[in-house]
């Protein structure tokens, strides 16, 4: 089978096509129908991935993940967009996406519900990842139960601490009744296979967290503008790479702000003073993705608003 390099992949536009239109699922033999669910200790397998895009090792786990993955925000977290969401998810899997990332807080559970309707029949095809935003043991265990129910699965491939921003949050997470105890218990019971942490505000806080605990993965903001302010590439990426963690990139376009196609709203409608600007960005989506993939990332999360 001919290997597809990153340049060819991006040039063919598969990155955009993977989440636009719906199609029927295929099993490993190319027949219409769902791929059977895997056992909790087995990696999922999408038969299309290896011919659709390059893959990378997901850190120390041994899983081969496609270089592009589907995120559970935008359309997927909006109530009333169930049909569109299911089409996006199914089409993404059909075209080789084998990693889906969501969170308990996305759309107050709507994202997990939308993904769960597809996972009911296609769980065996994708690495399924979600997050807890609670910093305590009890709160995180409650969220885990809710996530499993909404995602219609009995296990997660990855459970992550969501958007850790401040040192006091790190201290609470690692306290006697902190969320890290929930992550460890869930993994020891086989409900969760791997543990991760995420964030897109303060790289030095995340650096402290990954020095305290051997997480399997880290989801961080990585984009062409990152080096200019609170740089994840400069402050966090080297340590994550040194530890052999799976590195997942997000915020590739900084919510479109670095794209030349972005039209800034009037300044008085831009509520975040840190991001206020009268000018569009300077690069296109292909350049944004190419930059991200030049870094040592396992996969890059994309979302779609229809």
Positions of predicted regions on the chain:
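N-terminal secretory signal peptides and thylakoid transit peptides that target proteins
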Residues: 1-17
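C-terminal segment of N-terminal export signals and the immediately downstream linker at the start
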Residues: 23-68
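Beta/alpha (TIM)-barrel catalytic core signal, keyed to glycine-rich beta->alpha loops juxtaposed to Asp/Glu
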Residues: 45, 164-306
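Conserved, mostly hydrophobic/aromatic
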Residues: 58, 70, 100, 115, ...
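N-terminal small/glycine-rich loop or linker at the start of catalytic domains
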Residues: 61-76, 160-163
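Conserved beta-strand positions in the central sheet of alpha/beta enzyme cores
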Residues: 69, 99-101, 157-160, 196, ...
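Distinct, well-ordered alpha-helical segments
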Residues: 111-120, 140-152, 170-177, 201-214
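Alpha-helix-loop-beta-strand connector modules within alpha/beta enzyme cores
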Residues: 116-129, 181-185
């Amino acid at each position: 089978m001919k290997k597809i390099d990153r340049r060819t992949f991006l040039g063919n536009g598969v990155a955009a096509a993977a989440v636009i239109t719906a199609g029927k699922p295929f099993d490993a033999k190319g027949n219409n129908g769902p791929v059977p669910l895997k056992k909790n200790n087995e990696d999922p397998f999408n038969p299309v991935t290896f011919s659709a895009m390059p893959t990378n090792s997901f850190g120390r786990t041994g899983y081969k993940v496609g270089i592009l993955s589907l995120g559970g925000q935008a359309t997927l977290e909006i109530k009333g967009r169930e049909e569109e969401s299911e089409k996006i998810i199914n089409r993404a899997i059909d075209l080789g996406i084998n990693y889906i990332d969501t969170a308990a807080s996305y759309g107050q559970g709507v994202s997990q519900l939308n993904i769960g309707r597809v996972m009911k029949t296609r769980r065996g095809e994708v690495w399924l990842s979600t997050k807890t935003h609670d910093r305590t043991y009890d709160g995180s265990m409650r969220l885990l139960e809710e996530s499993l129910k909404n995602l219609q699965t009995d296990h997660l491939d990855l459970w992550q601490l969501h958007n850790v921003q401040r040192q006091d949050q790190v201290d609470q997470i690692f306290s006697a009744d902190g969320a890290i105890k929930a992550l460890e218990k869930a993994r020891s019971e086989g409900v969760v296979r791997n543990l991760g942490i995420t964030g897109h505000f303060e790289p030095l806080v995340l650096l402290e967290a990954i020095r305290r605990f051997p997480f399997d993965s880290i989801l961080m903001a990585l984009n062409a503008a990152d080096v200019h302010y609170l740089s994840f590439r400069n402050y966090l990426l080297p340590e994550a790479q040194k530890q052999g963690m799976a590195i997942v990139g997000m915020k590739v376009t900084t919510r479109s702000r670095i794209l030349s196609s972005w039209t800034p709203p009037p300044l008085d409608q831009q509520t975040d003073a840190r991001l206020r600007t009268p000018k569009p960005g300077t690069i296109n989506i292909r350049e944004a993705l190419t930059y991200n993939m030049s870094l040592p990332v396992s996969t890059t999360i994309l979302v779609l608003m229809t």
